[in-house]
Design a protein with these regions (language model features):
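Residues in the helix-turn-helix
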Residues: 49
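Short, charged, intrinsically disordered terminal tails
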Residues: 104-108
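C-terminal structural segments of small proteins and small subunits
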Residues: 77-103
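N-terminal helix-turn-helix DNA-binding core of bacterial DNA-binding proteins
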Residues: 2-3, 7-46, 68-82, 86
Length: 108
């Protein structure tokens, strides 16, 4: 699957803009692949709701699924998170440069 973040980071940030999806990604942050059943522990969400949120994360390239026997397991895709971080770093640098120019103009 082509990583959606390569051309447009918006789907990544849209997927991250939900508290439930952030919590799911947090559970996967240790690098371990987990089943939907494992991810639904300690939550009031149904397995169907967890599945829906995981598919949004998967469509954004933030998680990958793999089959283990009859079970689907999901794991975080660190490279997509790294791409999102790199995008935010670029935007931050651009703002720093712009604010630096504005400061020089105002003080100059």
């Amino acid at each position: 699957m082509l990583n959606p973040s390569a051309a447009d980071p918006a789907p990544i940030f849209a997927a991250l803009g939900d508290r439930t999806r952030l919590a799911l990604l947090g559970k996967l942050a240790d690098g371990q692949a987990r089943s939907i059943s494992a991810l639904s522990l300690d939550t009031a969400l149904t397995r169907q709701a967890i599945t829906k949120h995981l598919h949004v994360l998967q469509d954004a390239g933030l998680v990958a699924s793999l089959r283990v026997g009859r079970e689907s397991r999901f794991a975080a895709r660190r490279e997509t998170l790294d791409e999102a971080r790199a995008y935010l770093d670029r935007v931050s640098r651009q703002w720093d440069e712009t604010l630096g120019r504005l400061k020089a103009f105002v003080e100059g």
